[in-house]
Amino acid sequence: MSRSRQPPLVTGISPNEGIPWTKVTIRGENLGTGPTDLIGLTICGHNCLLTAEWMSASKIVCRVGQAKNDKGDIIVTTKSGGKGTSTVSFKLLKPEKIGILDQSAVWVDEMNYYDMRTDRNKGIPPLSLRPANPLGIEIEKCKLPQKNLEVLFHGMSADFTSENFSAAWYLIENHSTTSFEQLKMAVTNLKRQANKKSEGSLAYVKGGLSTFFEAQDALSAIHQKLEADGTEKVEGSMTQKLENVLNRASNTADTLFQEVLGRKDKADSTRNALNVLQRFKFLFNLPLNIKRNIQKGDYDVVINDYEKAKSLFGKTEVQVFKKYYAEVEAGIEDLRELLLKKLLETPSTLHDQKRYIRYLSDLHAPGDPAWQCIGAQHKWTLKLMQDCKEGHMKSLKGHPGPHSPMLDLDNDVRPSVLGHLSQTASLKRGSSFQSGRDDTWRYKTPHRVAFVEKLTKLVLSQLPNFWKLWISYVNGSLFSETAEKSGQSERSKNVRQRQNDFKKMIQEVMHSLVKLIRGALLPLSLREGDGRQYGGWEVQAELSGQWLAHVIQTIRLTYESLTALEIPNDMLQIIQDLILDLRIRCIMVTLQHTAEEIKRLAEKEDWVVDNEGLTSLPCQFEQSIVHSLQSLKGVVDCKPGEASVFQQPKTQEEVCQLCINIMQVFIYCLEQLSTKPDADIDTTHLSVDVSSPDLFGSIHEDFSLTSEQRLLIVLSNCCYLERHTFLNIAEHFEKHNFQGIEKITQVSMASLKELDQRLFENYIELKADPIVGSLEPGIYAGYFDWKDCLPPAGVRNYLKEALVNIIAVHAEVFTISKELVPRVLARVVEAVSEELSRLMQCVSSFSRNGALQARLEICALRDTVAIYLTSESRSSFKQALEALPQLASGADKKSLEELLNKFKSSMHLQLTCFQAASPAVMKT
């Protein structure tokens, strides 16, 4: 047997020495978890468990027993830790012997305590009693260890009445500190006592000497007289003479007392006749007495009288006796019928059932009343279960709302499962996103849940007594000893024949219990023929996952209670199958309800953005799933004997699909939020990162979210979901032993990425298209012609406007989420560079000034957004530059450089946002 605790260790005992029955306190570690855990305690090899009092895991109080060893360890043994060890020992001292005349606070067993050869005082004068202090001086007990004295005087004793008396040991033990002068006085006292004793004994003998002589003379005279009479030959020997005398005396006595002896014989015969009449009186009065005792319920008296009458008159041939005995048998037959009727009455306690069966057994009732009782109890249990269902259905029709069930069973054989309601894992659903409807579910029990509670309570109130009745029937304890001996072989045969019948009874009760619960909670799992008998509930709404988890806990407790009765597991397997189906159903319902809750999360989006550009929506989504999984922990975890809910591939697939559906529902919520009309958005509590620089002024409280800002917020949430939330949820699924996690993650990630890309493209389209569309009109504003233009004086306004628009996009994105800036600006720059490249390639020819102007503007744009360039945008800029003629002279190059520096200097403040460090990898 495996133990969960360390072995006991005794580290101290107080006191550490003493005589037997000394009260000691034992201290140590791991001395047991309670009084029932302590199963052994020995001190010096003696078992002291009977006197042990467990105080705590580190303290035990007990009394030392009559140990054989003088010194030994203190060994504590517990169920949880086994046999322990000791670092200390106890020394057992020999108790001082209490003298015959000494006062004592306890009773002394003198038969075992004193040596009767030396301590007896019957028939001898008081002077012969040995004094407690023979030396006559004060006794001072020695403090030397007893063990040392025993080693020093091996085989000797300090008891002066012992044959091995040692005077030296006696003096050391009682007079170790006595002075020499006192010892001299002690010798004088000892001599004086010896002389007094001798004188007293001699005087006693002298006083009774004359009595001894008189007795001797009388005995001698009797002996001589007998010898003289025996030698005479008068009428034979002395014995013959004595015989004749005795015979004459006898004859004379007969003559004298003949009349008296006659009267004695007559009195004896009269007495015998009266005794016989008294014996018959018992039989004559017995029928009336039987009726009276039956009315009073004194069945034991009736049975005893019947057994007595049966033994006296059962085989009589006297007609009068036969008549009265027949009346007795008729009364007993009525009693048998009455007892059988009471036995089969329901409800009845197990005690009464056993009592009636024993009475019927003593009365040798025909048939097998015990088996009849078992059958009646079985039918009664089935009827109660069906009545329970019908009663709740009537109550449901009369009161369709939830109610508090009235469990009217008096004897509850298990703790009420309502106490476990607050302990089921599902009840931790107190998050902020739950509505008030969940706050009252504890106090309103649905009818079907109340029915299951009452049904299981009913079964547990009936089945234990039913099972115990069968066990008593099997082992014969229902019957009296006489009935057991007379019908043992027949009953053994009946038990063997009825084992299968009883097994069918138990299975019928289990099947009825399971089908009634299935009819209430899982009606679709019933067969077509069982629907009317066990189903028929008017289901208005599906039970929530919390209530299903509570029902599972109720049935689990029922299963544990039935297992404790030692009912075979094969009879209870059907309950395990029910628990498995309910666990699967609970998981399905909980996940479906979770999907519905998550669908409503869109209504709770407050658009409050934290420093990372996130709203509370991803956190609420994760909390919702975590709470659902926590509520399912007790359901998913397997109790002893239970199978995993994911053992069937079909169940795995369904649960996996429900989990995927939950993730996709949330993704759909995000999509809804991104396309929600502006009028439906509440932005009164819009918040941004206070540390984010706002290039265009502060965002006020009455600022209204635009569709672009909503897209950015949703995109920011999508990024967080992909990097954190979905991975965390996958870990939670794995922690709770869910299957198909990889598939759930892959499908969810794919859907999320698809939404993210679609929303991103929408945002880029909203922001990049206006900028791209403004390039061509800006380039050719004022009838600008690349072939005929003035020398460049700087970057034209159209490019500055494009940069300002890009800066505005940067500011908008940066305000929501810093991490989205590289991704968004890279795509905007790609679109602008691609359009610029197209426009340059569409120009047929450039003048010298036109080529310089175009190169200036292309380089200015490229250098400004250099940190957001991608391979596509670099390629576009390269193609645009390749479409231009090469600079003709060094003067043009110098002019280009001067103009670029002038542009960067003049727009230094505006271009600062493009100088921040960007992540190395930009997602597009």
Swiss-Prot record:
Alphabetical UniProt keywords: Acetylation, Coiled coil, Exocytosis, Phosphoprotein, Protein transport, Transport
Top-level taxon of the source organism: Eukaryota
CDD domains in the cross-refs: IPT_PCSR (cd00603)
GO terms (BP aspect): Golgi to plasma membrane transport; membrane fission; mitotic cytokinesis; positive regulation of exocytosis; protein transport; regulation of entry of bacterium into host cell; vesicle docking involved in exocytosis; vesicle tethering involved in exocytosis
Chain positions found as Phosphothreonine: 440
Compartments where found: Midbody, Midbody ring
SUPFAM superfamilies per record: E set domains
Family the entry assigns: Belongs to the SEC5 family.
Free-text domain note: Interacts with RALA through the TIG domain.
Purpose of the protein: Component of the exocyst complex involved in the docking of exocytic vesicles with fusion sites on the plasma membrane.
Annotated protein name in UniProt: Exocyst complex component 2
Organism of provenance: Mus musculus (Mouse)
